[in-house]
């Protein structure tokens, strides 16, 4: 098991040309950063996710570089903006993999973009470490070179369903992104079937804005569920909850982690009361965990906003760095193998595990609830 002190101190070496003198090797290594590529939504309606993931990964690499980098070599993040658009992600990945200096990929965002990136990464034989999505494809064979650093949506949905089934509730509703219906509705139906619940109503919303909100609200009024699960981003969700949450204070409403929670709470204010959230990293107030403590300190130093998404990016960056340190060389194949050699990384709140046969690093899920002052309990 790799713990904090050992993690920060490690610096596995890459093989270098034997024809170079030690001094020349040191100079060459110091002069050339190891580059990892990112495609994420850095502008547009989903920019909150992309910038937070980028900033979290950057904070992790800052820490790694401060402690000697990888064999004395700094690690550099090259981020490209895809605006949350699948076609732009594909174009960005093509640019990144065409650059021989890009050794691995990291920090992708949204389901369509993460899926596109994962499939292309597998085809190109390059590691993709961490994506801000729990969509099933990332955990399957089509994403054979993707190493996930968050629990899947299946794990999050199951945690919510099991919690409310224990409380005796069985009738569930689902607000989902319209373009993800074919993936996420059957997934929830499967989870409910094995836990003795029923999906009684579904309502789609638009990933890019509030255009479908009125129809979703009307649909839910026809057959109110006992529990409402929501898997949507901020663009539709803020307006939806501003109208729906005050009407349904008693009804549990649980939002899956694919959301900029802090912005949502700030935008909703008192209207957030009673809205619950599933999270795939610990609350950033829990500084008893070394990884949280270290991130919060670095974030203050770097001026990085502290959110669950930026903390997830930080954890992703640490996992990536550990894979780089385990690689026998800087080749893309060696880095994939290096990720498979990470073993158990002790983050305090959970052990992230990667092996040759295990690419799902974390299964951690927790639940929280917004109070009347938009805080969390």
Describe the role of every protein-language-model region:
Residues 101-109, 129-131, 173-176, 224-234, ...:
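Periplasmic-binding protein-like
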Residues 37-56, 80-86, 109, 179-182, ...:
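Extracytoplasmic "Venus flytrap"
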Residues 1, 23-41, 48-50:
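C-terminal segment of N-terminal export signals and the immediately downstream linker at the start
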Residues 243-313:
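Extracellular/periplasmic periplasmic-binding protein-like sensory domains
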Residues 6-28:
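N-terminal export signals
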């Amino acid at each position: 098991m790799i713990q904090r002190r050992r993690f920060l101190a490690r610096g596995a070496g890459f093989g270098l040309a034997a024809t170079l003198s030690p001094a020349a090797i040191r100079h060459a290594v110091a002069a050339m950063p190891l580059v990892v590529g990112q495609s994420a939504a850095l502008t547009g309606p989903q920019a909150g996710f992309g910038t937070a993931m980028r900033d979290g990964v950057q904070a992790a690499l800052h820490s790694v570089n401060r402690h000697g980098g990888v064999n004395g070599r700094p690690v550099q993040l090259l981020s490209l903006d895809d605006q949350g658009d699948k076609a732009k992600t594909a174009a960005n990945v093509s640019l990144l993999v065409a650059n021989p200096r890009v050794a691995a990929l990291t920090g992708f965002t949204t389901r369509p973009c993460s899926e596109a990136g994962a499939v292309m990464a597998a085809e190109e034989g390059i590691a993709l470490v961490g994506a801000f999505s729990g969509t099933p494809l990332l955990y399957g064979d089509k994403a054979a070179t993707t190493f996930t650093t968050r629990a899947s949506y299946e794990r999050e949905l199951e945690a919510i369903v099991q919690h409310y089934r224990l409380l005796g509730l069985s009738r569930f509703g689902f607000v989902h992104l319209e373009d993800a219906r074919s993936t996420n509705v059957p997934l929830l139906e499967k989870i409910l079937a094995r836990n003795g619940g029923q999906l009684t109503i579904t309502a789609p919303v638009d990933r890019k804005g509030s255009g479908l909100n009125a129809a979703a609200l009307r649909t839910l009024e026809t057959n109110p569920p006992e529990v409402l699960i929501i898997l949507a981003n901020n663009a539709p969700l803020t307006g939806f909850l501003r109208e729906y949450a005050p009407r349904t204070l008693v009804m549990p409403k649980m939002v899956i982690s694919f959301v900029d929670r802090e912005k949502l709470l700030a935008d909703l204010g008192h209207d957030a009361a009673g809205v619950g959230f599933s999270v795939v990293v610990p609350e950033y107030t829990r500084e008893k965990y070394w990884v949280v403590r270290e991130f919060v300190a670095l974030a203050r130093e770097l001026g990085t906003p502290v959110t669950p998404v930026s903390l997830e990016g930080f954890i992703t960056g640490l996992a990536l760095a550990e894979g780089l340190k385990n690689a026998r060389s800087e080749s893309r194949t060696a880095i994939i193998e290096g990720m498979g050699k990470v073993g158990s990384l002790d983050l305090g709140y959970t052990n992230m595990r990667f092996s040759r046969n295990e690419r799902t690093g974390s299964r951690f899920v927790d639940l929280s609830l917004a109070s009347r002052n938009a805080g969390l309990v």
